[in-house]
């Protein structure tokens, strides 16, 4: 069972101008004391076509965390507009909140984000080059997509050091019929849990 349960994420300052910081009020509960930090990240998906446009807007370490209920406001600057493809500036994209423990992601919360011009004239005749000062960001706060992953909460430093010192041959664990591809790192086994907070 997961030792951390995310109880609520409130989207603050929404809708807002595109250049405003993202703000999320995160409430979570620890079932027992966690001796190491939780790492929270806010990731802006710049393009659905490629992960190369994803931007980690901020990362924060919280911990060690005592058992009980906790709340904090996680704020991150708006994405770097120079890294967003012009064709993806206006329209729907995604912002992700992730949390890891000992380097293992155990929850991913995704929100759809609609970036649009507030001026009706700009909506009808958008400029060729996006004008980010005129864009409004609206996060669909009512319908987050939540994915949970099983992780090893009990990993000890000795076990982690041992695993770092092993140099396995590439694909040594794969049957001949398996081709390497994109998959979660070992130890992150999705429990096929997608639901709303």
From Swiss-Prot:
Any single Pfam family the record assigns to this protein? ASF1_hist_chap
Q: Does the keyword Chaperone apply?
A: yes
The Gene Ontology biological process annotation of the record reads: DNA replication-dependent chromatin assembly
**Where is this chain primarily localised?**
nucleus
Alphabetized, the UniProt keywords read: Chaperone, Chromatin regulator, Nucleus, Transcription, Transcription regulation
Where in the cell?
A: Nucleus
Q: Which cellular component terms (GO) are annotated to the entry?
A: chromatin; nucleus
Q: Which GO terms describe its molecular function?
A: histone binding
Keyword Signal attached: no
SUPFAM superfamilies found in the cross-reference section: ASF1-like
Q: How does it assemble?
A: Interacts with histone H3 and histone H4.
* Family as reported in the entry's similarity comment: Belongs to the ASF1 family.
Q: What does this protein do?
A: Histone chaperone that facilitates histone deposition and histone exchange and removal during nucleosome assembly and disassembly.
Name by which UniProt lists this protein: Histone chaperone asf1b-B
Q: Which gene encodes it?
A: asf1bb
